[in-house]
């Protein structure tokens, strides 16, 4: 796992990444991982090396988190998504898959809506309660909703109401911070969905 800095509208964006041993040639679609509020891209330290075997995986510290510069004033989910979009533009991704965990799932949703040609597949893990069901309904890409037994266990099923065609997986055996360790019960099905 490596780290680097990239420019975005808020300043520098600190990014953790894993690249396949072959240097990224003949790999699957790159994956962008967006962390929960109060955490950093390090919350994916168990996922990065596993999924990074066959695709490039990027886990930025969201603007204002960890080692990333933040906005001068509180930013909306749409504004944070636009800042992450700056990173996608600087990397010149033609297509990318996006995984959002808790608050990161809201940002992932906004990226999917704003960039329908670029975002190929969306994984939403532990979806916060939202009154933005109409926004979720605008996601046109294939969606996989993963429900670990965390503080959002009760709210995550509501996302299924807004996304009735989404695949869904309940993981009552896995709790909060499931990607900080090797969570094969989650990573295996995510890998399978992304390969589809």
Predicted features by range, described:
Residues 174-183:
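Catalytic histidine-centered segment of alpha/beta-hydrolase-like enzymes
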Residues 18-67:
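Conserved HGGG/HGGXW glycine-rich cap/lid loop of the alpha/beta-hydrolase fold
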Residues 58-99:
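Active-site loop/oxyanion-hole signature of alpha/beta-hydrolase fold enzymes
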Residues 139, 145-147:
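Short beta-strand/loop motif that positions the catalytic acidic residue
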Residues 1-31, 54-55, 167, 173, ...:
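Alpha/beta-hydrolase fold catalytic core
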Residues 94-130:
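Conserved hydrolase catalytic core segment
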Residues 151-157:
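Conserved alpha/beta-hydrolase "acid-adjacent" motif
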Residues 148-151, 173-175:
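Acidic beta-to-alpha connecting loop that harbors the catalytic carboxylate
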């Amino acid at each position: 796992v490596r780290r680097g800095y990239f420019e975005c509208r808020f300043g520098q964006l600190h990014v953790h990444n894993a690249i396949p041993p072959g240097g990224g040639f003949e790999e699957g679609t790159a994956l962008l991982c967006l962390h929960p509020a109060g955490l950093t891209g390090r919350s994916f330290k168990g996922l990065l090396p596993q999924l990074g075997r066959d695709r490039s995986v990027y886990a930025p510290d969201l603007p204002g988190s960890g080692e990333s510069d933040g906005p001068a004033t509180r930013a909306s989910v749409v504004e944070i998504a636009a800042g992450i979009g700056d990173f996608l533009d600087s990397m010149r991704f033609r297509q990318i898959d996006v995984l959002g965990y808790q608050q990161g799932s809201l940002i992932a949703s906004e990226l999917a809506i704003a960039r329908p040609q670029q975002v190929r597949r969306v994984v939403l893990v532990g979806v916060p309660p939202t009154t933005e069901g109409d926004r979720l309904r605008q996601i046109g890409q294939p969606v996989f909703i993963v429900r670990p037994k965390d503080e959002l266990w009760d709210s995550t099923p509501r996302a299924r109401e807004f996304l009735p065609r989404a695949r869904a997986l309940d993981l009552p055996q896995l709790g909060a911070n499931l990607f900080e360790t090797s969570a094969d019960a989650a990573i295996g099905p995510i890998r399978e969905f992304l390969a589809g």
